[in-house]
Amino acid sequence: MSANKELQQGYSDYSAASDQAALLNRLITAMQKGELTDELLEHIPELGDAKKLNDKLKYRKSILEKSIAEQAAKNKKNGVKATSTSSPSSSTSAPAEKKAKKDGKTGGAPPKQAKKVDYVTVEDYGSSIFGRLQSLFKKAIEDAFPGLDVPLLLAETPNPQFGDYQCNSAMPIAAKLKANKINKRPGDVAKEIQAKLPTKIDFVEKIDVMPAGFINIFLNTDYLRRQISLLASEGVKLPKLTRKRVLVDFSSPNIAKEMHVGHLRSTIIGDSICRLFEAVGFDVLRVNHIGDWGTQFGMLIAHLYDRFPDFLKKLPDISDLQAFYKESKKRFDEDEQFKKRAYEYVVKLQSHDGDIVKAWNTICDVSKKYNQIVYNYLDIKIKDVGESFYQDKMIELVKWVKTNKPDMLREEDGRQIMFPTGCDIPLTVVKSDGGFTYDTSDLAALKYRMLEEKCDWNIYVVDSGQSLHLETVYAAGRDFGWYDESIQRVEHVAFGLVLGDDKKKFKTRSGETVRLLDLLSEGVKRATEKLIEKGRETAMSEEQLVAARDAVAFGCVKYADLSHTRTQDYVFSFDRMLEDRGNTAVYLLYAYTRIQSIFEKDEVKNVDLVKYIASTPTLPLDHPGEFKLAKQLLKLSDCVLLVLDSLMLHQMCDYVYQLATLFHDFYNECYVIENKEGEKPFVHMHRLALCDVTRKVMSTCFKILGLREVNKM
């Protein structure tokens, strides 16, 4: 029996190796011939992006060459001598045109507005100290120097002898005044700013102005103690903001292809941004712009009919979506009769033929079922609104443009194209055969979201390679008058790549794209091994072990992504993610469970804590460890406002990591429960209250970052 199993395994391994060898052979052949096959583009997605950009640049080149030729003909007719003998592709004799500034970080996207817009409207800063200081100093500077446009320079001070915060705006103001023939020393400018501040600020102890122009701000320690007491009694209250209707477009996998590591960042970052918006009370639309339409569905439907003829009665058990897609593509490439049927099904699908639409729905349902497993693992809530949703809306879009903005369209080689303001690469609105493009679809989506969904903010969480395309679409939306960028926020939240240890795009050992389900399953396996290695299976029930395992497995993957600056690439490493030291999810979860363990002790009674907090409006925080922790706790609102503006989640990760570190320091330096020999354990209630506030603040951060809380680990 054992020999038979080994033989079967050998056959299986041989078959897999043969398939892999055949795949590699096809890829090599395609590269040698210079053919951009679907398989090649799937294994090297950068080629697809490069091809799209190359096609657009080729088009731009042809426009320039035509312009040069026309200008040369005019010059010859008018007797103007050429100033250069360079090739037609040279820009020397080309007519001057407004061109977009190239930017390596945006993939050559046109520059955004020069003046930054504050899209976040704060109605009540709550416990935010930095936010309130910003508001006070902005007004003071405006009152002292009306009409002078200078940025506010306000920051925490690294040295406590210079206070808690420092305003350094006096120096650039003095420089600007000097440029306007007004001579004032920075120290005098600083005094004028101070004079415009309220004489009494409840959270400020004193303000010192230095001769060099530095304004040092010292916080009122009693105010901080009172605020911590309020947090303990009333819970965490984030700043009150003017409510916005926000749409976040994220994740967006293709139907009939399993989610892979390339979808990881958009899914995690997009979900966390949604959680942040929801935490401050915004009305959030979570949109999954799935690729559920296109000519590829013809071959998929034809293959479905052949493989699962009873699909109309029973949802087919397609165990490997990738294999199903590749099988259909292979038949499409090699079988002319199959290809003919596939094209017929495309026409029928576009005509909304009943059975063909059911077949299309079946393929979509199978694919969505797989996607939902990933979303369940990662606690992602999202609504599918795919390409198919915009099919009718693209027709409406073209009619709208031709009726309302006909001058913006021009015909070129049978295509209807447009050049939005500031963009030197066009959008193709209608193809020469009358069909539509991704440009058309994205324009229709933007129009629908701004005019029909009436979104105040429209956030696209898409990789940085799409920056040029998206900024061009946004520019078209502004030209069409769909939104006013001084009021409505339409923004591309770009992110970098996930890399392997070799600093190349993350792949399997065989060079395949890493399936997201496989990646998450590996995380579960490694988290289990880590917990067993620490001997935790003996200290926890089976239910607690599973909860800890999932919190660590999925939390470490999420946090590793979010804790890196999103615009940069990062190296994926389970070993680093599962470290219990440093800026990792495990370290944060360990800090949280340490707090929970304090509240599980027999000496701690929640009813006693509630009574203590109710009778103590000002917590007696005197130890340096207590005070450092308290100050960090009160920075949560400032952190939230910062991330709402930047949409950089690593800033929140930095905040909660610093909080966890300060809590560990506090825990090691300050007894919460003091045990003296022969005496009853003594509970320091003010420190217990500080622990309670810390876990509440950490819990708020965890919810925004999408981490699961655990009581034991």
From Swiss-Prot:
PROSITE patterns hit by this protein: AA_TRNA_LIGASE_I (PS00178)
Organism superkingdom: Eukaryota
Record-level GO cellular component terms: cytosol
Motif 'HIGH' region: chain residues: 252-263
A single GO molecular function term of this UniProt record: arginine-tRNA ligase activity
Alphabetized Pfam families for the sequence: Arg_tRNA_synt_N (PF03485), DALR_1 (PF05746), tRNA-synt_1d (PF00750)
Region (Disordered) residue spans: 74-113
Keywords: Aminoacyl-tRNA synthetase, ATP-binding, Cytoplasm, Ligase, Nucleotide-binding, Protein biosynthesis
SUPFAM superfamilies xref list: Anticodon-binding domain of a subclass of class I aminoacyl-tRNA synthetases, Arginyl-tRNA synthetase (ArgRS), N-terminal 'additional' domain, Nucleotidylyl transferase
Region (Interaction with tRNA): 583-597
Top enzyme category: ligase
Ranges of biased composition (kind: Low complexity): 81-95
Family to which the UniProt record says this protein belongs: Belongs to the class-I aminoacyl-tRNA synthetase family.
Protein name: Probable arginine--tRNA ligase, cytoplasmic
Source species: Caenorhabditis elegans
Gene expressing this chain: rars-1
